[in-house]
């Protein structure tokens, strides 16, 4: 049995699966990345710890994501940690555009969508309307629906809710779904080209320019 995205299981699911696996006396492979959570609940479940401490298993660690090329991987690493700097890298397949407001961002995103770019949105709310729903074009692709997929050309949005903590870690205003984690989920879908749209956020624009010009 192979359970992919195991870090997103609920505790009751983990209990049920492990009980059935033990009863049937079969082998199971849990594939997980503790960084790939979308809500704070998934982080608090800490399934990685339960898998490694409660089960008789041998963890194997993959050093790099297979789907992501080094250029994009280096950019992501520096974007999510402003204290990480990797000099001597060129980024010919990463584009950067700044929009001063949601209206211009929505126009640009629709243009990119028409040109064949994949634009997974941040997951919309079920009871509330979040700010990011105002600029994404109408499409059915969101952070939750693209889990496990990959695309050649991906466009992402970094709006005014993103900033760095005092220790340099990227963060965002928390909703029910973590916007920071949704960004990580979306940006790691890119296989060949990445287009970053920064909206009304001068400090994040400066960081992106700093990375691209190293």
PLM features: residue spans?
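Conserved helicase motor core of SF1/SF2 NTP-dependent helicases
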Residues: 1-114, 121-214
């Amino acid at each position: 049995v192979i359970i992919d995205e195991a870090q997103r299981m609920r505790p009751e699911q983990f209990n049920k699966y492990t009980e059935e696996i033990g009863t049937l006396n079969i082998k199971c492979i849990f594939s997980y990345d503790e960084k790939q959570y979308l809500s704070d609940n998934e982080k608090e479940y800490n399934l990685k710890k339960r898998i490694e401490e409660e089960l008789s298993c041998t963890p194997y660690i993959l050093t790099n994501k297979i789907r992501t090329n080094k250029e994009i991987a280096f950019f992501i690493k520096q974007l999510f940690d402003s204290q990480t700097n990797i000099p001597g890298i060129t980024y010919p397949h990463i584009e950067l555009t700044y929009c001063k407001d949601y209206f211009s961002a929505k126009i640009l995103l629709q243009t990119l969508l028409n040109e064949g770019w994949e634009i997974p949105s941040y997951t919309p709310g079920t009871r509330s309307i979040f700010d990011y729903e105002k600029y994404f074009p109408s499409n059915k692709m969101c952070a939750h629906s693209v889990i496990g997929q990959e695309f050649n050309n991906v466009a992402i949005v970094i709006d005014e809710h993103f900033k760095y903590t005092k220790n340099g870690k990227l963060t965002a205003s928390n909703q029910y779904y973590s916007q920071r984690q949704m960004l990580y989920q979306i940006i790691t879908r890119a296989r060949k080209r990445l287009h970053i749209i920064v909206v009304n956020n001068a400090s994040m624009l400066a960081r992106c320019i700093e990375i691209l010009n190293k």
